[in-house]
Amino acid sequence: MPAIQPLLYLTFLLLILLYLIITLYVWVVSTITYKTAVRHAALYQRSLFRWSLDHSL
């Protein structure tokens, strides 16, 4: 068995781990951003609706 084999295996494992961490991080960030954006949009829409109602009277 060549000496490079375990090193290659370790590198491959590290790359997979890195990929998983990055994917998880991106997923969490996008989920949080999406939820925050939706909440802000709902609040903005509500306040805009209220404002238009107040000004129409």
From Swiss-Prot:
It is a single-pass membrane protein. One of its GO terms (cellular component) is membrane. Keywords: Host cell membrane, Host membrane, Host-virus interaction, Inhibition of host NF-kappa-B by virus, Membrane, Transmembrane, Transmembrane helix, Virion. It is found in: Virion membrane; Host cell membrane. GO terms for biological process: symbiont-mediated suppression of host NF-kappaB cascade. InterPro entries: SH (IPR001477). Residues 1-8 are virion surface. Its main location: virion. The chain crosses the membrane at residues 9-29. Residues 30-57 are intravirion. Belongs to the rubulavirus small hydrophobic protein family. Interacts with host TNFRSF1A, RIPK1 and IRAK1; these interactions interfere with host NF-kappa-B activation at the level of receptor complexes. Interacts with host protein UBQLN4. Plays a role in the inhibition of the host NF-kappa-B pathway. This inhibition occurs at the receptor level, by preventing the signaling of TNFR1 as well as IL-1R and TLR3. This is Small hydrophobic protein. The gene is SH.
